Amino acid sequence: MSSRKQGSQPRGQQSAEEENFKKPTRSNMQRSKMRGASSGKKTAGPQQKNLEPALPGRWGGRSAENPPSGSVRKTRKNKQKTPGNGDGGSTSEAPQPPRKKRARADPTVESEEAFKNRMEVKVKIPEELKPWLVEDWDLVTRQKQLFQLPAKKNVDAILEEYANCKKSQGNVDNKEYAVNEVVAGIKEYFNVMLGTQLLYKFERPQYAEILLAHPDAPMSQVYGAPHLLRLFVRIGAMLAYTPLDEKSLALLLGYLHDFLKYLAKNSASLFTASDYKVASAEYHRKAL
C-alpha cells in the first residue's frame, strides 16, 4: 500500500492549509508578535509528543509556528527598503543593506537541509507482509483482477479491532490515548491518500464507480486490508510534511510498526486471493 510532496499531500495530493497572519503597522507590535510566537513554541513541544491532531493528518502539531516569525522578518525588510527609496541623493546606496541581510538567511537554509533529511523517513514493512504486497500487485496489474468492494472487513473495522486489542492489554491511560490518536491518524491519511496514491491504474474505474454509488462514504468504510497495507509503503513520505520533532516522530513510527506487526500476526484472515475477482470485459474497456 503509504517522504514529501503533498502534505500531506501524499505526492501531489495532501497539502497543509496556510494560515493568514495580520501584519502589524508598528515595530512594537512586531516585537509583541514575536514574543507571542516564541511563547507558542514552548507549548507546542509537549503537544507534539502527545500526537495532537492537525492537518493533513492527526500527527502534524502546529504547522503555523514558523510562518509568524517569517512574516515579521519580511515586514522589517520592507520597512527598511521604503525609507531608502525615499532618500533623494542616496537612492543608489539604499538597496545595498537589504542585499547584505539576504545573506543572513543561514537558519532558513539549515532548516531546509533538515527538512530534506526527514524525507528519508521509512516505515519498515514486516517480512511476513512483503510477499503479499507482491501478490496484490500481480493479481491486479497482471491477472487483471479486482479486490471486491465493499470489503468484507473494511479499514475502519480493522483499526477498531486493533485499538480494542491494545486496550485489552491494560495499557496506561496516556498510551491508550496515543493508540486512539494513531488509529484516527491512519484512517485520516488513508481516506486522503487512497484516490491519488494507493490505487493501480486498472483500479481507477472501480474507484469512480464507488464514488458514484457511495458519494458520502469514507473510503475507509469501503476498502480493506490490501489497500491499507499499501498505505504504509507511502506514508513515510507524507510524514516529512509534519513538524514533529525527532522524539515525537520516533514515537509515532513505533506505533505504526506495532500496527504492522498486528497486520502480520493476523495476515491469514486479512489477506486472501479469494477476495479478488476477474474483471469483466466491459470493465476492461473502461480501464483502457
UniProtKB/Swiss-Prot annotation:
Residues carrying Phosphoserine: 71
Domain MRG: 117-288
GO biological process, one term: positive regulation of double-strand break repair via homologous recombination
Region entry Disordered, spans: 1-113
GO CC entries: NuA4 histone acetyltransferase complex; nucleolus; nucleoplasm; nucleosome; plasma membrane
Positions with biased composition (Polar residues): 1-15
A Pfam family it matches: MRG
Source organism superkingdom: Eukaryota
Localisation per UniProt entry: Nucleus
Task performed by this protein: Component of the NuA4 histone acetyltransferase complex which is involved in transcriptional activation of select genes principally by acetylation of nucleosomal histone H4 and H2A. This modification may both alter nucleosome - DNA interactions and promote interaction of the modified histones with other proteins which positively regulate transcription. This complex may be required for the activation of transcriptional programs associated with oncogene and proto-oncogene mediated growth induction, tumor suppressor mediated growth arrest and replicative senescence, apoptosis, and DNA repair.
Protein name: Mortality factor 4-like protein 2
Source organism per UniProt: Homo sapiens
